[in-house]
C-alpha cells in the first residue's frame, strides 16, 4: 500500500503509487532481496483507465530492463481508502 508513516493513504494517486513502491523496496531489502528477485506482481486499481499511465511509469523505474516479472492488474471497487495496492511473489536464494 502507498501509506504514509501514520498508515493513512497519500492523498495524491501518484504519491500513493510511489510510496507503495518505496514501501515494497524497504520490505525487500529487509528480506535480503531486491526488485530483481520479484517473479510475479499483482496490482489493484480503483480506476484502471485513469491510473494506468502513472503505474506504468513506476513500473519502468522499478523494472528498467528484462527479464520483467509476470504482472496482473486488477480493477477493484474499494481498497479501504486507498486507490492502489501491490502484491508480489519474490524468489529468495537459499
Where are these regions (language model features)?
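Short, polar/acidic, helix-capping and beta-turn segments at strand->helix junctions
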Residues: 1-94
Amino acid at each position: 500500500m502507498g501509506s504514509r508513516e501514520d498508515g493513512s493513504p497519500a492523498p495524491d494517486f501518484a504519491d500513493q503509487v510511489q510510496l507503495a513502491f518505496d514501501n515494497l523496496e524497504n520490505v525487500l531489502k529487509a528480506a535480503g532481496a531486491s526488485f530483481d528477485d520479484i517473479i510475479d506482481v499483482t496490482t489493484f486499481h480503483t480506476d484502471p483507465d485513469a491510473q494506468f499511465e502513472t503505474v506504468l511509469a513506476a513500473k519502468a523505474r522499478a523494472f528498467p530492463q528484462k527479464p520483467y516479472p509476470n504482472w496482473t492488474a486488477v480493477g477493484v471497487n474499494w481498497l479501504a481508502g486507498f486507490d492502489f495496492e501491490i502484491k508480489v511473489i519474490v524468489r529468495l536464494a537459499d
